[in-house]
From Swiss-Prot:
GO cellular component: cytoplasm
Binding, ATP: G307, A308, S309, T310, G311, S312, G313, G314, E315, I316, R317, D318, S887
Amino acids binding Mg(2+): D679, E718, N722, D885
Family: In the N-terminal section; belongs to the FGAMS family.
Organism field: Hahella chejuensis (strain KCTC 2396)
Disulphide bridges, residue numbers: none
InterPro entries: Class_I_gatase-like (IPR029062), FGAR-AT_N (IPR040707), FGAR-AT_PurM_N-like (IPR055181), PurL_large (IPR010073), PurL_linker (IPR041609), PurM-like_C_dom (IPR010918), PurM-like_C_sf (IPR036676), PurM-like_N_sf (IPR036921)
CDD domains found in the cross-reference section: GATase1_FGAR_AT, PurL_repeat1, PurL_repeat2
Protein name stated in the entry: Phosphoribosylformylglycinamidine synthase
Subunit composition and interactions: Monomer.
Recorded GO MF terms: ATP binding; metal ion binding; phosphoribosylformylglycinamidine synthase activity
Gene this protein is translated from: purL
Reactions catalysed, as given in the entry: N(2)-formyl-N(1)-(5-phospho-beta-D-ribosyl)glycinamide + L-glutamine + ATP + H2O = 2-formamido-N(1)-(5-O-phospho-beta-D-ribosyl)acetamidine + L-glutamate + ADP + phosphate + H(+)
Major localisation: cytoplasm
């Protein structure tokens, strides 16, 4: 082994934050410096030339300090005995560069901690705990410790539990020590089963049974029988959910039997490459919609980043593994936590009840968890388009007396939708001898016992077991797996997949038995064929670990050659680990130890111990009245705007890519000022249609503290009023996912759960004609701990989170909260609460530390159905200019958010609504269902008539009107009872987000964004074009029939190739899918092409720098280098690099004539991934792609973490002077800017695209290919029809080729 120092691992900003963290534990620490250390394991010597290549490979990131840093060394490295995902990718890159003498490269971080006195062993331990993740990393105080990275561990043997000698007691002890979470009747069942088999169980079999039969996996409570007040109930909880399908399952193609539900979609052209020719094309067919929503609550409480990240990853795998292979498309995320208690910003309703040591604080969850969820989606390439965020923690009355209710065990929701072919919805039969395959990453000792651990109340397990049950993520690997699945489903009837499942809770021990059971077979497996990056693991650890990014599948023997080709091209690892058998038995042999860790009849593993039976008695309690009549309106309004469920969610949104796929039509950000106020997400079905899909969420959990069934009805109602903004043909087109969280067994909670499921499943949804074809439950929502002598607990309210999905008729007709001030208009409230104005469970009650006695409710489902039909009709007729539903914070919040989205003011009059001023608070802040619509004055009567004809005449109230003057006034009897400037109101609403952003990211950037809210004159996004957006300058060339081929180039981890291909296809090119493996193998030569586009994503997961690993595998591979150099030097070629492709090509500048002065692109100034819509100016440059566009200013999608052009002031000025700069960021006034977020990455002079001297090679960080359609722009001028402004760039390319 030898080591090589690398770049600084932390920016000055991150270093300062870390120092403050460490000083809380060790005040004597004065400095900290961190740099990467690389460790290289060789099986032969490197030549001098190879050593140079290695040195250059490991030079990435910012410049480090040359002298050795001083201070105590904390060397953080991957846990010895494991191979990190970073190592696998870096070693692959090294091998691609011809460095085959390298066995492995591994990376650690050397932290040098300077202190005023020698650190004690206790202090060292405390600092080490801050610096590393003990699940996946180790800490050494000497470099030599890293030698252990390459040591070879001997496998550990299995053990058995001696029940033949010690009986049931032996199993009960194993249950406790192994954290199996077996119920008493399950212990009896297993004791009996193995006694009958005449042998002792192995530890592997016990863990496998525990995972397969955990509450997490088998949903025992939802399948239980119930007795209430002595009366046996006729339905289980699951039976009541299924009732919605039995009553109205039309257009549901798959429910309750697969990883996700499938519902009917519309027709369109699915755009993908032909397997044989690799040319992209449209395949017109039914594009059905799949829907899934998961929770990952337990892991997120323990380790928020990893918990949320793997939660998203697991849900994405569920979608991909639907039917016999499907395509995930768009994601949603939600969080519910206890009070944030932001330092220096503590709110009047926030107390400090404490928490157990083993879980992190609500604040830490919300600083780290959302980044984890967003990072996985970003790297995988799935846009995150909607969600929710709620905090709740309060001492309230219940059947148990006064007790603390809240979310110390958080809710982390990961969900989404995708598409699937009609012929792939049903899984196929598994043939005897079919190959059983693990696709994806290797086994590692992470996430052990996650299914069982998440089934226990938080605090009931041992802390080490808690931590061991959290998985770790590798999204780039999952992307590779999905590419293989994509290649399979794109083959249509020749799809080689017979059956597929994702690997989740319980690891292979759950996934493989489930695969063969569902396929009607048994399975014979060889343990040592499981890919394993941790050779020292025991059989239990190999079989049961929850390493992520894995799928299991069955492939017929005759299709293995095809499947192998697909995997090799995508560089996706797979292994045949067994074969399907006629005998219904699971047998796992272990050739290393020559034994069988598992040898069980399927009937034992899946045979059920007695079904759970739950007996409850109804109880009641006195609910104190919440009196709002004496409240100060101004104080109440400001408190509500600061409550996280109401406040701006910007800090949760801009971290997530919302443009990838090029099919996003409506994300959270609305209008020219990109206000985070949309409650519905809308995507197009493909690039050739206006049909699409919509999704939205609904949840009103605090209501459950006083009226659980109401909370369920209100959650469903909110999802519907959110979805109503999209153009959906009929209410029954909406299908719901229901995620149920409860503290089962806690007094009153079983009754709350049963009654709410009944209200939703047996009553409300059947009345509305709506089906719930998918869902999830988490039944252990209670945290218990000891503080001194005191026993403490925090119990979550019953929590139903609804996610609604529907096909959309026309994505162009999605309504938003942005108002149109071009003609006089009125704002109308449609009040589905019938003037009852109930305040129980409201934001108003919460900010005054109350919960109230009477909750809002959906009293009349027929009225909700009529409301939905009216909104759809009026939208179709063009009578509605804006729409926003009423929810958290009441109509006050609804109106404020409409003003923020429109950068305008409004005058609202309550004269017709309240006679007595003391009732204004109830009118303003009640959270009854409803919506506010903006209607032109000329259409007000027609709109009222429409609602009257639907029986809703008494529910429509004219509230007032919007106006350009930015004052927001609420008036009663001629007096302003509440008045603000729009800017002042918006800053109150945005401050919670700003504070979180300041703590998490570069605080200077957060402050600049916050300050920009004040600018009343900010014109917002605009499009000032020097060309006609609707002119097709490529038409004459397309009409000749010639379609020049363009290489749409990708590397492993790239995720934006489809939209790039679609844009060039529309411009008259024949887009060819080319993987770097095609070039390196010699299967494809660039000499055959005149055009190349390098796409965005995360090649190699950004290992060795963003785009740098990809570039170096070209620079240091003779075949690839020669091809790229020749291509760049030919005068008849052009190339475009976008985002990751830009980062890659900029690192190839030594091969490109006239690119000497190009910058590299490094970490954003904000220190955060930035997903924005930014204004750019097209500069006068020789870029052949931007000819005729100079002087134009228009919006463009931005989504990257490393886009800052690394060039000094002189270098930047020189690039400008030489006309090598093609695009630069400008603010909304059209001025070049350094200010955040108008310059999202902080590049000097706003530089975000450069070209070479002759203009043939252009690279840019923003994404024109994602917004080539007008409908794919988050905001667009109304004059645009089909084409967006950036389509001209692709047509310029076609014109240049002639």
């Amino acid at each position: 082994m030898f080591e090589l120092r690398g770049a600084p691992a932390l920016s000055p900003f991150r270093r300062e934050k870390l120092l403050k963290n460490i000083q809380e534990q060790a005040p004597e620490v004065q400095s900290v410096y961190a740099e990467y250390m690389h460790f290289v394991d060789l099986e032969g010597d490197l030549s001098a030339e190879q050593r140079t290549v290695l040195d250059r490979l490991l030079q990435y990131g910012p410049q480090g300090q040359s002298e050795m840093p001083s201070g105590t060394l904390f060397l953080v490295v991957p846990r010895p005995g494991t191979i990190s995902p970073w190592s696998s990718k870096a070693t692959d890159i090294a091998h691609n560069c011809g460095l085959t003498a390298i066995r492995r490269i591994e990376r650690g971080v050397a932290y040098h901690v300077g202190s005023s006195e020698q650190l004690s062993s206790e202090r060292r331990a405390a600092i080490a705990a801050i610096l590393h993740d003990r699940m996946t990393q180790s800490v050494f105080h000497e470099i030599a410790g890293a030698e252990l990275l390459f040591a070879h561990a001997e496998p550990k043997p299995m053990t058995t539990v001696d029940i033949l000698a010690d009986g049931r007691d032996a199993l009960a002890e194993a249950n406790r020590s192994m954290g199996l979470a077996l119920a008493e009747d399950e212990i009896d069942y297993l004791t009996s089963a193995f006694t009958e088999l005449g042998r002792n169980p192995t530890d592997v079999e016990l863990m496998m049974f525990a995972q397969a039969n955990s509450e997490h996996c088998r949903h025992k409570i939802f399948n239980a029988t119930w007795e209430i007040d002595g009366e046996v109930q006729s339905h289980s909880l699951f039976g009541m959910i299924r009732n919605t399908y039995e009553q109205g399952g039309q257009d549901v193609l798959s429910a309750y039997c697969d990883n996700a539900a499938v519902i009917k979609g519309g027709q369109g052209g699915r755009f993908f490459p032909d397997h044989r020719t690799k040319i992209y094309g449209y395949n017109v067919e039914d594009i059905h919609i799949l829907m899934k929503v998961e929770t990952h609550n337990h892991p997120t409480a323990i380790s928020p980043f990893a918990g949320a990240s793997t939660g998203s990853g697991g849900e994405i795998r569920d979608e991909g593994a639907t039917g016999i292979g499907a395509k995930p498309k768009a994601g949603l995320t939600g969080f519910t936590v206890s009070n944030l208690n932001i330092p220096g910003y503590k709110q009047p309703w926030e107390g400090d009840y404490g928490k157990p040591e083993r879980i992190v604080s609500a604040l830490q969850i919300m600083l780290d968890g959302p980044i984890g969820g967003a990072a996985f989606n970003n790297e995988f390439g799935r846009p995150a388009l909607c969600g929710y965020f709620r905090t709740y923690e309060e001492q309230v009355p219940g059947v148990n007396g006064l007790e603390w209710r809240g979310y110390h065990k958080p809710i982390m929701i990961a969900g989404g939708m995708g598409n699937i072919r009609a012929s792939h919805v049903e899984k196929k039969d598994i043939s005897v001898d079919a190959k059983l395959i693990v696709l994806g990453g290797p086994a590692m000792l992470i996430g052990l016992g996650g299914g069982a651990a998440s089934s226990m109340d938080s605090g009931a397990g041992q802390e080490d077991l808690d931590f061991a049950s959290v998985q770790r993520d590798n999204p780039e690997m999952e992307r590779r797996c999905q590419e293989v699945i994509d290649r399979c489903w794109q083959l249509g009837d020749d799809n080689p997949i017979l059956f597929i499942h994702d690997v989740g809770a319980g690891g292979l021990s759950n996934a493989l038995p489930e695969l063969v059971k569902d396929g009607g077979r048994g399975g014979l497996f060889e343990l040592r064929d499981v890919p394993n990056d941790e050779p020292g693991m025991s059989p239990l650890e190999i079989w049961c670990n929850e390493s992520q990014e894995r799928y299991v599948m069955a492939v017929a023997e005759q299709d293995m050659e095809l499947f192998d080709q697909l995997c090799r091209r995508e560089r996706c690892p797979y292994a045949v680990v067994g074969s399907a058998t006629e005998e219904l038995k699971i047998q796992v042999s272990d050739e290393y130890f020559a034994n069988s860790p598992v040898d069980l009849p399927m009937s034992v593993l899946f045979g059920k111990p007695p079904k759970m039976h739950r007996t409850i008695e109804r109880k009641s309690f006195t609910k104190p009245i919440f009196d709002s009549t004496t409240l100060d309106l101004k104080e109440a309004a400001e408190r509500i705007l600061r409550l996280p469920s109401v406040a701006s969610k910007s800090f949760l949104i801009t971290i997530g890519d919302r443009s990838v796929t090029g099919m996003v039509s409506r994300d959270q950000m609305v209008g020219p000022w990109q206000a985070p106020v949309s409650d519905v997400a809308v995507t197009t079905a493909s690039f050739d249609t206006y049909r699409g899909e919509a999704m939205a969420m609904g949840e009103r959990t605090p209501i459950a503290l006083i009226d659980p069934p109401s909370s369920g009805r209100m959650a469903v109602g909110e999802a519907i009023t959110n979805l109503a903004a999209a153009k959906i043909e009929k209410l029954s087109d909406i299908k719901l996912s229901a995620n149920w969280m409860a503290a089962a067994g806690h007094p009153g909670e079983d009754e709350a759960l049963f009654e709410t499921v009944k209200a939703v499943g047996m009553e409300l949804c059947p009345e509305l004609g709506i089906t719930i074809p998918v869902g999830k439950d988490s039944m252990s929502m209670k945290t218990v701990w000891e503080e001194g002598e005191k026993q403490k607990s925090v119990t979550a309210p019953l929590s139903l989170i609804i996610s609604g999905f529907a096909p959309v008729e026309d994505v162009r007709k999605t309504l938003t909260p942005q108002m149109d001030l071009s003609t006089p208009s009125k704002l109308l409230l449609i009040d589905l609460g019938s003037g009852k104005n109930r305040l129980g469970g409201s934001a108003l009650a919460q900010v005054y530390r109350s919960v109230g006695a009477v909750a809002p409710d959906l009293d009349n489902p027929e009225e909700l159905a009529a409301f939905f039909a009216c909104i759809q009709k009026l939208n179709n007729e063009g009578k509605l200019k804006a729409y926003h539903d009423r929810s958290d914070g009441g109509v006050f919040t609804t109106l404020c958010e409409m003003a923020f989205a429109s950068r305008c003011g409004m005058t609202i009059c309550f004269d017709g609504l309240v006679k007595d001023r003391t009732h204004i608070a109830r009118e303003l802040f009640n959270e009854e269902l409803g919506a506010v619509v903006q209607v032109s004055e000329e259409h007000v009567d027609e709109v009222k008539t429409c609602f009257a004809d639907a029986g809703l005449a008494d529910h429509v109230v004219v509230l007032g009107e919007p106006h350009a003057d930015q004052s927001v006034k609420f008036q009663h009897e001629g007096q302003t009872v509440l008045g603000y400037s729009r800017g002042a109101l918006q800053k109150i609403w945005a401050e919670t987000s700003y504070r979180m952003q300041s703590m998490r990211d570069n605080s200077e950037c957060a402050a600049e964004e916050f300050a920009a809210i004040d600018d009343d004159n900010d014109p917002g996004l605009s499009a000032k074009l020097t060309y006609d957006v609707n002119e097709d300058i490529a038409a004459p060339f397309i009409n000749r029939g010639a379609k020049p081929k363009i290489v749409v180039l990708r590397e492993q981890g790239v995720n934006s190739q489809a939209e790039m291909a679609a844009a060039f296809d529309r411009a008259g090119f024949s887009a060819v899918d080319v993987h770097m493996s095609d070039i390196l193998s010699g299967a494809v030569s660039l000499s055959q092409f005149k055009a190349l586009a390098a796409c965005g994503g995360f090649s190699f997961g950004d290992v060795l720098g963003a785009g740098e690993g990809w570039a170096k595998s070209i620079l240091f591979n003779a075949r690839a280098r020669d091809q790229f150099e020749a291509f760049f030097h030919r005068k008849d070629t052009f190339a475009l690099g976008v985002c990751n492709g830009c980062q890659m090509i900029s690192n190839l500048k030594e091969l490109i004539p006239g690119a000497d002065a190009w910058p590299r692109f490094v970490r954003n100034r904000s220190e955060q991934y930035e997903a924005r819509v930014a204004m750019v100016e097209v500069l006068d440059s020789p870029s052949i792609l931007l000819q005729g566009m100079a002087g134009s200013m228009m919006p463009i999608a931005v989504a990257h973490g490393e886009g800052l052009a690394e060039v000094g002031p002189e270098g930047a000025a020189a690039l400008m002077a030489q006309k090598n700069v093609a695009l630069r960021f400008v603010d909304n006034y059209g001025r070049p800017t350094m200010s955040h977020p108008f310059n999202p990455n902080g590049s000097p002079l706003g530089i975000t695209s450069v070209c070479n001297d002759d203009g043939r090679i252009t690279v840019m960080m923003p994404h024109p290919e994602r917004v080539f359609r007008a409908v794919a722009n988050s905001w667009r001028p109304s004059a645009w029809s089909e084409d967006g402004a950036w389509m001209r760039m692709f047509r310029n390319a076609r014109v240049w080729l002639g």
